[in-house]
Amino acid sequence: QRIVQKLGLQVHSFTHRTRKYSSYRGSVGTVADNLLNRRFKTSIPHQKITTDTSEFKYWLQGDDGKPVAHKLYFDPYMDLFHAEIVSFHIGQTPSAVGIQSALEEAIRVTADCPYRRTFHSDQGWAYQMKSYTKRLKEERIFQSMSRKGNCLDNSVMENFFGLLKQEIYYGRVYHSYEEL
C-alpha cells in the first residue's frame, strides 16, 4: 500500500463507490427460512438455484447536452452445481414481471432434477410476492431466503456480480441500454 502511494498509483477498478441496489422493501409477503444456510455445494445438477438482482448504469445525453444516468437491472438464476446461469432477465426497471419470466425459464431448465429443488434469494420484495411463492409451491420447489441484511447468505451470487462488474463494467462508460 505505501509503495503504491509513494509512486502515485491508483487502482481504478476497485475505487467505484456507489450506492448498492437494494430490493428490500420490508415484509411485503412471505419470508422463507434460510434452508441453504450457506451450504452452496451440491453434487446434483439443478438441485440448488440462487438468484438476486443487480443494478447497472448507462449514460444518455440529456436535452441540455449533459449526461443523464439511466439504470438497467439484471436478474440471473444460477445453478450451484457448476455456477452456470440457467436463466436471466434484463430490464430498465426492477420488475416482478421480469423476475417472474426468468423464474419460469429457470423452472423449465431445471425440471430434469430427480430431487426436490431449492431456489434461494435475498428478501427482496419480488421474491416475497404471492405469485412468486405460489409458483414455487406449484412446482414443489423449496423456497429459501437469506437473513435480512446478510449478504454472506447469498455470497455465491454476490461474488458473481462482483466478478461480472469487475470484468465488463467498472472503468467503462456505456452510452446506451443496448451497448451495456
What is the meaning of each model-derived region?
Residues V4, L36, D52, A83, ...:
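Mobile genetic element proteins and their domesticated derivatives, centered on retroelements
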Residues R38-V86, Q92:
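An active-site-proximal beta-strand-loop segment
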Residues P114-T118:
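Catalytic core of bacterial c-di-GMP phosphodiesterases, primarily the EAL and HD-GYP domains
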Residues Q128-E138:
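Active-site/catalytic core of tyrosine-dependent DNA strand-transfer enzymes
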